[in-house]
Amino acid sequence: MDYKKTLNLPDTPFPMRGDLAKREPAWVAQWEENHVYQAIRAASRGRPRFVLHDGPPYANGDIHIGHAVNKVLKDIIVKSRNMAGYDAHYVPGWDCHGMPIEIQIEKKFGKHLPVTEVQAKARAYALEQIDRQRKDFKRLGVLGEWDRPYLTMNFSNEANEIRALGGILQKGYVFRGLKPVNWCFDCGSALAEAEVEYADRVDPAVDVAFPFADKPGLAAAFGLDSVDDGAVVIWTTTPWTIPANQALNMHPELEYALVRATPAPAHGPLLLLARERVEACLKAWGLQGEVIATAPGAALSGLRFHHPLASADAGYARTSPVYLGDYVTLDAGTGVVHSAPAYGIEDFVSCKAHGLSDDDILNPVLGDGKYADSLPLFGGLSIWDANPRIIEALKAAGSLMDVQKLSHSYMHCWRHKTPIIYRATSQWFAGMDVKPADGGPTLRESALAGIDATAFYPSWGRARLHAMIANRPDWTLSRQRQWGVPMAFFVHKETGALHPRTAELLEQVAQRVEQHGIEAWQSLDPRELLGDEADQYEKNRDTLDVWFDSGTTHATVLGGKDQALGGSHGAELAWPADLYLEGSDQHRGWFHSSLLTGCMLYGQPPYKALLTHGFVVDGQGRKMSKSVGNVIAPQKVSDSLGAEILRLWVASTDYSGELSISDEILKRVVEGYRRIRNTLRFLLANVADFDAVSQAVPYGELFEIDRYALTMTAQMQAEVLAHYERYDFHPAVSRLQTFCSEDLGAFYLDILKDRLYTTAAGSLARRSAQTALLDITQALLKLMAPILSFTAEEAWQVLAQSALQHQADVSRTTIFTEVYHALPPFADADALAAKWARLRAIRAEVQRKLEDVRTAGGIGSSLQAEVDLYAGGDDRALLASLGDDLRFVLIVSRATVHEAQGELRVEITPSAHKKCERCWHWRLDVGSDADHPEICGRCVTNLFGAGEPRDKA
């Protein structure tokens, strides 16, 4: 007789190999065909709402690994919240306006297209990019409203953005003024703080002499009768700002010295600088010197000095006063700072505080980085090309004390990677410290209070965002571009004042934009709205900062507080969002701009919590770089290993810091995935012939180890769900993997194989095991589904067509309409957990002893062994309570418990009996049945009798 055929060997259509790269696209297609996202929405309707608002990626170029991390994390959260009993929509979005797309249009079609053509081509280009990115995001297994995403260039979004601008204008936050702003010559526009990055750069550092212009005043300040000729010396790394110098700054409390230098410099023997910098500076200049008098900076306020190029050209025949400033330091230089108010924020504030008007500020640098032609000596030159010319002119004028090359971290445009400057321009600002119209807190005050009311994951994000808001300047809202939402103001041609009906006019423009897009503003004849007043006003040509685009999506998409704007997806979503989730750079980007617009419009943040993830680096911790050759593209991983492996990598990595990825790291992820898949395959194979409706054993009648397994599963599920609740995915993955490999694979399933395979197919012993396995399988699949979406769906379809095929409340379409599994509670759960925890510890000790004997050649498999356990007290009672089932727990052919004092003692003896050909146990009764001499008595009764007596394991 072929006894192998009498075993209940497992069988399942769920394959051992996932073949993920080949099979995943079919699942993506099936989810679309079956309208799975819509099915989730229908199943979730009426539940408490959870809103994760998608930070929009920019609609330009293929997605990179950072995009994949971001979208997978969002997908895990949305799926886990839906399965936890929430109504969690996912509406993906795209950021569509702005410079990068405008640059692409210029590259393709040239720089001199009419604005209407630029806008039309930019809109078409953005749609092409969105289609490419959407395909890649869907390939990652991300479910969402892909057919109806929000786009910042949707007409309704553009219109509501204009309404949002009107809202903050009415509340008193918006003003126009001249201020130094971050300016990129390549963009030809102001930049937001978030668009500035820093890179090392070498610049000339110069020490420049400003000759004395008020010697009597200087003598009096130092308590001297008179002074000889001389100069005050400044240090700067921006020689190009010297032509625009209008003041000098000293610290009121620092001590300044008059030094008689030898040999005498060109402007005279006396030099003025900070006392603490005298020795270092004289050494650098190759001079000897003697301090003849000192005075505090406060005594020097208002003194005047000639421009260092006054002798070179009459255009520089002016003097610069000393203004006092606490920001002057002694870290480098001379303790005296030269001030060109058009090109530095502190310089600007200082000069304005001392009465300099906007019209008085010298601003010779044009938007393209060249000096105005009217500038003496350097007109028409690029400021970078002018640096050496200015240094030569200073030298010729006798005003150059020293020049060195300095490598330092300097501001660059994040798009062009070129250096930028501060440049005073007339811009529209949102004031951080202006009192709003209602007299309430300033924007800075309300934003800082909002940060305190927001939850942060990880917690350090709070301090980071707080510091940024506390120290940031006013927000430059305006940009000088074509592809952007217009600041649709009518400005008086003579006074520069806004039209008195601006609020009403903005709404009228918004209504037109709602129908025809921002192009409606471009084509609008002012007479249509202003009538006879049109000749007095001009259309403002500025566009809104793209960070205002994305920063107002909480209003334009979610609808704003109390659905004030009735956003594009306000019916599905809600305000404020429960969560914003982006990379750590968004503390100065989307988190930041959204906070400011939320506080301006509604007095509070548009989110309840912020989650930040780190950047992706290679296995050595290096930034991804094409030049280094360490870039890992998500498309390539999906096409080779499968998107499931990327999802598992994301979930199993601590995203609060940098996320490391490499081929070697992905190999380890693949190994972890295989172990999980093998566990699932075993579970599915062993419930394939089980029917949940007609064959389930009541929970109170389950074998003891089966009840323990369900208790163990419930504990694991509670831990994983707690991790999900806190967005801690890597410990959740670790717990799931440990459960599969140790709790199931190395313990419960290992013990269960004998009962599943050898007892009668319909016996209580086997059905008890299958009842527990089915609950475990359902719980496990649902817990894995948010992360291993493809695999969980594949396994669920197998389960739904086998063990669950007759269960009415089970989804046949998708696992994602399910909620987390309700595991049965047991009154003795704590006692079960404690008992079996000790039994597992004893089992581990027995396994170590068995391995020693196996290594020594005494036995082959553990079933060849017989075990004698010597124990007293609780251990003896524990072991004895299992009766003959103890041998199945230990996976040996005999296990006998003996009363003994002291610690547990284990003795292993190779069995002297024959091996049963069916169950492989070595038993005394093998051959006792004449009709079946090859098998043991237990197998005989399982095959031909009432079945073995057994109720523990």
UniProtKB/Swiss-Prot annotation:
GO terms for cellular component: cytosol. ATP binds at K626. Its EC number is 6.1.1.5. A motif ('KMSKS' region) lies at residues 623-627. Binds 1 zinc ion per subunit. The keyword Protein biosynthesis applies. A motif ('HIGH' region) lies at residues 57-67. Its cofactor is Zn(2+). It is an enzyme of class 6 (ligase). It catalyses: tRNA(Ile) + L-isoleucine + ATP = L-isoleucyl-tRNA(Ile) + AMP + diphosphate. It holds the Pfam family Anticodon_1. Keywords: Aminoacyl-tRNA synthetase, ATP-binding, Cytoplasm, Ligase, Metal-binding, Nucleotide-binding, Protein biosynthesis, Zinc. Belongs to the class-I aminoacyl-tRNA synthetase family. IleS type 1 subfamily. Catalyzes the attachment of isoleucine to tRNA(Ile). As IleRS can inadvertently accommodate and process structurally similar amino acids such as valine, to avoid such errors it has two additional distinct tRNA(Ile)-dependent editing activities. One activity is designated as 'pretransfer' editing and involves the hydrolysis of activated Val-AMP. The other activity is designated 'posttransfer' editing and involves deacylation of mischarged Val-tRNA(Ile). IleRS has two distinct active sites: one for aminoacylation and one for editing. The misactivated valine is translocated from the active site to the editing site, which sterically excludes the correctly activated isoleucine. The single editing site contains two valyl binding pockets, one specific for each substrate (Val-AMP or Val-tRNA(Ile)). This is Isoleucine--tRNA ligase. It comes from Bordetella petrii (strain ATCC BAA-461 / DSM 12804 / CCUG 43448). The lineage of its organism: Bacteria, Pseudomonadati, Pseudomonadota, Betaproteobacteria, Burkholderiales.
